[in-house]
Amino acid sequence: MQEQAQQFIFKVTDKAVEEIKKVAQENNIENPILRIRVVPGGCSGFQYAMGFDDTVEEGDHVFEYDGVKVVIDPFSMPYVNGAELDYVVDFMGGGFTIRNPNATGSCGCGSSFSCG
């Protein structure tokens, strides 16, 4: 019996794509590749790290939205599978947020999460 490959999903809202393009343009980045990683740290065990990258590494999961590539490494992908990157503006300003259905808890500051 052949094993079926797992289908990974990571969504990026139109607002987030717009903001990624804006930040890339401000930094003279022509073909933006946004890398999202899950790293150990914070009060709850894991936290997100995001930044522009120059390359897509072997094994990376690549999601493309309107010319913006979002790449996630193989370690991080199971932790963010089904999650959504958004850009929200509130009275404190604007920022990226990840809505993650895999997160079973988060700390009070909102910068780290746990998975169970």
UniProtKB/Swiss-Prot annotation:
InterPro entries with a match to the protein in the record: FeS_biogenesis (IPR000361), FeS_cluster_insertion (IPR016092), FeS_cluster_insertion_CS (IPR017870), HesB-like_dom_sf (IPR035903)
PROSITE patterns cross-referenced by the UniProt entry: HESB (PS01152)
GO biological processes: iron-sulfur cluster assembly
UniProt xrefs under Pfam families: Fe-S_biosyn (PF01521)
Superkingdom of the organism of origin: Bacteria
Protein family: Belongs to the HesB/IscA family.
Protein name: Protein aq_1857
Species this protein is from: Aquifex aeolicus (strain VF5)
